Amino acid sequence: HLKGALALKKDHRKAVTLGQGKTLGMLFFNPSLRTRLSTQKAGRLLGMEVVVMNFGSEGWQLEFGDGVVMDGGKAEHIKEAAAVLSQYCDVIAVRSFAELKNQAQDQADIVLNGFLKYAGVPIVNMESAAGHPLQALADAMTIEEHKKRAQPKIVLTWAPHPRALPQAVPNSFVEMMQLMGGPTAIAHPKGYALNPELTRGIPIYHNQEEALEDADFVYVKNWSASDPYGAVLNTDPSWMVNLDKLGSAQMMHCLPVRRNVVVADDVLDSAQSLVLHQANNRTYSALYVLHQILQH
């Protein structure tokens, strides 16, 4: 997929008619900047009509449970909603964050899987409770374009944040690290372990400096605790990434980033920051996924 995405980025002009007469429906249960605009742009580059709905504020509240007596606040069941949307759209893209209340429920990805189960058209994940694959593909493209050796060392490090954030981005980045090969490491304080099925085989450090040793790429990201799930256990500013810690490595972050909390100004304003390259590649990761769907 990585080679295909990079090739399409270089030469996508020929694909401008592939999506003609097709409609991409984008449903947002949560806020978005990069995902929303890059996926819209990708659809348009393929000639698709793009319709966007902020489902959280504009749609009916959806029920996802089977056999529920719907006498509460939820007005429509996913069965009807997904079936109706499938009549209007040839591809449906969905963004729905983790609620960070119940780990098993978030890992079950109820909203995304509800659409997968009841829609009659392909579904694109624009960040779900458990993962953000469009971001991970853009990240892989960015690493491939900027690596200085065949098997660079890739490190994922936790950094502090005042709010509880989902584990979706780190989950997908870890899956991508496993596929890239080469040396890897993950650094986080105690209590912040990611899904052990995803991190299997990757060295885990509670000492950030040790993990960052000889790193080529440092991916900085906050996520909330695993035990107790969804909590903010630690806001230790010494975990913030600055140029001293980064050394000669290149820094990555999915954005939005809180300056001087997660990453210092001196890093974000330096040539070692790849965040704008990552954001640019968001268009091309979405383009590749939509291109694959339209071709098949």
Annotate the PLM regions.
Residues 119-121, 182, 244-250:
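A short helix->loop->beta-strand "cap" motif at the edges of active sites that frequently abuts
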Residues 1-37, 41:
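Positively charged, low-complexity intrinsically disordered leader regions
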Residues 269-296:
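C-terminal helix-to-coil terminal segments
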Residues 29-51, 144-220:
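Glycine-rich phosphate/diphosphate-binding loop of Rossmann-like nucleotide-binding domains
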Residues 74, 79-83, 90-176, 253:
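Anion-binding alpha/beta catalytic cores of soluble intermediary-metabolism enzymes, centered on
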Residues 198-273:
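Rossmann-like adenosine-cofactor binding region
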Residues 18-24, 151-153, 248:
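Phosphate-coordination loops involved in phosphoryl transfer and adenosine-cofactor binding
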